[in-house]
From Swiss-Prot:
Keywords, sorted A to Z: Cytoplasm, Methyltransferase, rRNA processing, S-adenosyl-L-methionine, Transferase
Gene name as annotated: rlmH
PANTHER family in the cross-refs: METHYLTRANSFERASE, RIBOSOMAL RNA LARGE SUBUNIT METHYLTRANSFERASE H
Protein's recorded name: Ribosomal RNA large subunit methyltransferase H
Native species: Histophilus somni (strain 129Pt)
GO cellular component terms listed in the entry, alphabetical order: cytoplasm
Chief location: cytoplasm
Annotated positions binding S-adenosyl-L-methionine: L72, G103, L122, S123, P124, L125, T126, L127
Function summary: Specifically methylates the pseudouridine at position 1915 (m3Psi1915) in 23S rRNA.
Subcellular location: Cytoplasm
Amino acid sequence: MKIQLIAVGTKMPDWVTKGFEEYQRRFPKDMPFELIEIPAGKRGKNADIKRILEQEGKAMLSACQKSRIITLDIPGKPWTTEQLAQQLEAWKHDGRNVALLIGGPEGLSPECKAATEQSWSLSPLTLPHPLVRIIVAESLYRAWSLSTNHPYHRE
């Protein structure tokens, strides 16, 4: 199973790239973790936000191919590390790849929300989207380590 993190935004600060890559490199070869960056639409005072969301959504969904789509969204379901480890195991048994979607400044398009099979909430807080990349990478790595009895996760 391959996991794709599909996120709006391409020019991240170095600390985001380094933080994400630190966890990305730890994933096992049988569960590669890939970042796909979708260019953000141009935003300005006269920007058509609905059209921008639609374009970003189309690009995100086309990157998903036939993967199980999971959106990162505040109203989604919060998972403990143990629950995320169980989700990871269920996704593996499903036989499809997994695409996790992180929207841009205005969130996810209605099309992305309609296509999702699950919605995951990291927090009731609004988090900066660059930071979410690192939190998701670490959380997935921790869940994997729990399910494989790797010493990274400690009770």
